[in-house]
Design a protein with these regions (language model features):
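SAM-dependent transferase fold signal centered on methyltransferase-like domains
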Residues: 1-333
């Protein structure tokens, strides 16, 4: 005989209203399936006190019942298999997992996530002139390239050939909300274009540059893939290329966290008076915004003023180290 549990019998026209009320009050038993017949909906509920019953009576008429509510079937998760929640990042159909129990995590991800076709693990920090990482193949198809979707755009990415992380997605959207149609934007370290193309889509006139030839090829492909034409793409040293645009930029993006400080002077020269620079760096937890001193020193060398508009932690980078952003306005005399 099937085991019966507590529920509420509600006329169909009130079913959705009551379901939402139960969810809001934390009283819907999500481990069991909702039942229905031609005239009524049967909602599985958790134990409730008399005060909750009185509140629900104000939502819609109901009748308490004991009924067979079958268990709610849900897909298995990596946590179900492993016994803990693993840490991983997903770019397109590629999952990036940490070394250690990488094989076990990879097997759990492949088994439970239809969208994941590749599992790799980084075996180096961001390194070299083109700020790339090396990876070890763990499971699935043997590749590091994929198509990643973010904020309505598609990006062709080769994780071993050009740096990309989906963990900056929220930050990219924050910047997009600050940029107005018609603004002139200089993206000094554009990579495959996640800042540049999002801002161009919003109507900004974008100049995107990078020294990495593979990143530039991906960026060019991504501009075509997303049918974006209001962008100029340049391959070369940002310190030199930025000087083509002295005094023109409404916004300058400096997403090169490990060495952006070396490019502060050309970035400020490219900004117009009143323009805003979005500066990213890696900093220790006990001195998150220490690079403000470097920003002011660079401004002093140009006889310019700076006004810090925003400081924030973008993401945790390593134990007691964070990727931070400092937005500042440049004022030229």
């Amino acid at each position: 005989m099937a085991e019966e549990s507590s529920g509420l019998r509600v006329r169909r026209e009130y079913g959705e209203r009551m379901r939402k009320a139960l969810v809001e009050k934390g009283l819907l038993d999500r481990s069991r399936k909702i039942r229905a017949d031609e005239s009524h909906v049967y909602l599985p509920v958790l134990d409730m006190d008399s005060a909750s019953r009185i509140e629900l009576e104000q939502i819609a008429p109901f009748e308490p019942v004991q009924k067979d509510f079958p268990p709610e079937e849900r897909p298995a998760t990596p946590e179900d298999i492993l016994g803990y929640r693993p840490s991983f990042e997903v770019v397109g159909d590629i999952a990036l997992v940490e070394e250690g129990d990488a094989e076990a995590v990879a097997a759990a991800l492949i088994a439970t996530s239809k969208g994941i076709k590749v599992v790799i693990s980084p075996i180096s920090e961001v390194e070299g002139e083109f700020r790339t990482r090396r990876f070890r193949h763990i499971a699935g198809e043997a590749r590091t390239s994929t198509i990643h979707k973010e904020h309505g755009l598609r990006y062709r990415v080769d994780l071993e050939g050009a740096y990309f992380t989906e963990r900056l997605g929220t930050e990219r959207l924050r910047i997009a909300k600050l940029v107005k149609p018609g603004d002139f934007v200089l993206d000094m370290f554009a990579g495959v274009g996640p800042f540049s193309l999002l801002l161009a889509k919003k109507g900004a006139q974008v100049v995107a540059m990078d020294k990495n030839p593979l990143a530039i090829r991906c960026l060019q492909e991504n501009a075509v893939l997303n049918k974006i034409r209001n962008i100029e793409i340049l391959e070369g040293d940002a310190a030199e290329l930025a000087l083509r645009y002295v005094g023109r930029a409404d916004h300058v993006i400096m997403n090169l966290p490990h060495s952006a400080s070396s490019f502060l002077v050309p970035a400020m020269r490219a900004a117009k008076s009143g323009g805003v620079v979005h500066y990213y760096c890696i900093a220790p937890e006990d001195d998150l915004y220490r690079d403000e001193a470097l920003i002011r020193k660079a401004a002093d060398s140009l006889g310019a003023g700076v006004d810090v508009l925003y400081r924030g932690i973008v993401r945790s980078y390593a134990p007691r180290r964070h990727n931070v952003v400092i937005d500042f306005r440049v004022t030229k005399k």
